Amino acid sequence: MESSFIFGCVAEKMTSAIPDDKNWYLKGSFDKANRTSVEAPRGPGIYDSIDIFEDIKEKFTNIKITTDIHEPWQAEKLRHIVDMIQVPAFLCRQTDLIRECAHNFDVINVKKGQWMDPGSMRHVVEKIRYYNEDAKVYITERGTQFGYDRVIVDYRAVDIMKEFCDGVILDCTHSTQQLGQGTTGGNRNLAKAYVKTAREFGYDGIFAETHPAPDTAISDKDSQIDLEWMASVINTI
């Protein structure tokens, strides 16, 4: 989440583009805790972000908010304002983090670790339901490690993971990432193709980073999708 202004721009544009009967979440990260460079901006922090989330919900009453957490104590702080909590891919096996997510939230989205096979995600879902048997659990595919510096999407994973979770989401932007020297690259055109074709491969939904001016984005600028384009196609997929 670069700023409250940009977050508000995305909220306004997507709210006007998506019908009220569609199930969607506005996502903003309060802390980009795994930036490639120690000098890279990380975000506004949890407490300022809670204020931003509250302002957005007051202005757009039909919006549901999601964010990701990195430490167990953060779950309790967010439970009153966040509708779905996200477990980052790098942390998807951390039992203490998963426990606190399950104790504080009934809707949980787990990003599949880039190194994990689809079937192994069953154990992550079982952990969540051990602590909250009524939790609705989604798994987000964000690519599988392919060599040292890139990820690819294995479409065979969809049906495997659907057997033990409530829905499988395709992360259209992070799934194009290419690791670099101090920055993370990506492929915006490929991300757009994923947006358009995810349904054909059986995904239940999409996750995508969008920005009013992607080339100026502080994070993941090579894979972020232009906000105008996203708003124009969201109801055609």
Label the predicted regions:
Residues M1-I52, E58:
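Conserved N-terminal beta1-alpha1 strand-loop-helix module at the mouth
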Residues F7-S16, H80-F90, T95-N104, L179-A213:
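A short alpha/beta connector and helix-capping loop motif
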Residues T15, P19, F53-K59, A102, ...:
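Surface-exposed amphipathic alpha-helices with a cationic face
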Residues Y25-K27, T66, Q86, N109, ...:
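Conserved beta-strand positions in the central sheet of alpha/beta enzyme cores
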Residues V38-Y47, Q86-L91, Y148-I152, S175-R199, ...:
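Active-site-adjacent loop and "lid" segments of alpha/beta metabolic enzymes
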Residues P44-G45, F60-Q74, D83-L97, D106-P118, ...:
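Catalytic beta/alpha-barrel core
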Residues F105-T210:
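Catalytic alpha/beta core domains of metabolic enzymes, predominantly
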